[in-house]
Amino acid sequence: MATAMTVSSKLLGLLMQQLRGTRQLYFNVSLRSLSSSAQEASKRIPEEVSDHNYESIQVTSAQKHVLHVQLNRPEKRNAMNRAFWRELVECFQKISKDSDCRAVVVSGAGKMFTSGIDLMDMASDILQPPGDDVARIAWYLRDLISRYQKTFTVIEKCPKPVIAAIHGGCIGGGVDLISACDIRYCTQDAFFQVKEVDVGLAADVGTLQRLPKVIGNRSLVNELTFTARKMMADEALDSGLVSRVFPDKDVMLNAAFALAADISSKSPVAVQGSKINLIYSRDHSVDESLDYMATWNMSMLQTQDIIKSVQAAMEKKDSKSITFSKL
């Protein structure tokens, strides 16, 4: 026991010496529990973010280090119009570079998450492309589809964890969107529908590529895709599409913001590095992923966040008391 205490003292001394040789540690004196922090955050009036001004979505600062991206066309059931496909890309490109943001919650305003693509607004682009030459029309449509695909790929490429909070219907493009998110919560009344076959086309902006890897049950994915049937909340939970189901939207959003607060209290170097490596590992072999991880961590292991975390643990302080620098 005495030997262990001596080793711990020496390790603590070494950590303190290294910290003094770089920069001073600053601790957040607040030791509030996650639940109390989440309750306070849920009561806080959201503040609009000045550099996020959009027609189809609304971005607010839900709490410290957490942004709330809300699909904001409730009168149109949050249908995805022309502006949406452009604005969501711009939004997440900004979030990716926002050093103050550490987690994002995505939800829908009104009675449902989204009804999918706004066919009334997008019909001319898709059904009446410009030109009369088959090859040139094909090039136009390929470019159009590629731009739509980028709308959701930008979520996946954003290093900050993205939590989808789904209520009511999540139809068509909505499934493409949530498949690109990192964590999915839903309400008991939520349903999910790969709707594209009902309008005569194959889903082309991410569902067919990501959903099999999210659920891990190709037979079920094929069934949902070929029939456009609704998957209800309980089945979504059983299949792994969502990780938790809540009785209503308010309870779900409070839980999503609490989760985001918990994530944002961790080292952003560790969290964002974990997301990047999880996605890389999904698409590569174990050996390739291990090699990528080794290359990644040969620089990331030099972060002061490790020293701060170890010191807090040895001093038996709440990890939420640590102040991590922006990333």
UniProtKB/Swiss-Prot annotation:
It comes from Rattus norvegicus. NCBIfam families: PRK06142.1 (NF004794). Changing D176 to A/D: Strongly decreases dienoyl-CoA and trienoyl-CoA isomerase activity. It catalyses: (3E,5Z)-octadienoyl-CoA = (2E,4E)-octadienoyl-CoA; (3E,5Z,8Z,11Z,14Z)-eicosapentaenoyl-CoA = (2E,4E,8Z,11Z,14Z)-eicosapentaenoyl-CoA. Transmembrane segments: none annotated. Substrate binds at S115, G116, I117, D118, L119, G173. A motif (Microbody targeting signal) lies at residues 325-327. Gene3D superfamilies: 2-enoyl-CoA Hydratase, Chain A, domain 1, Lyase 2-enoyl-coa Hydratase, Chain A, domain 2. GO terms for molecular function: delta(3,5)-delta(2,4)-dienoyl-CoA isomerase activity. This is Delta(3,5)-Delta(2,4)-dienoyl-CoA isomerase, mitochondrial.
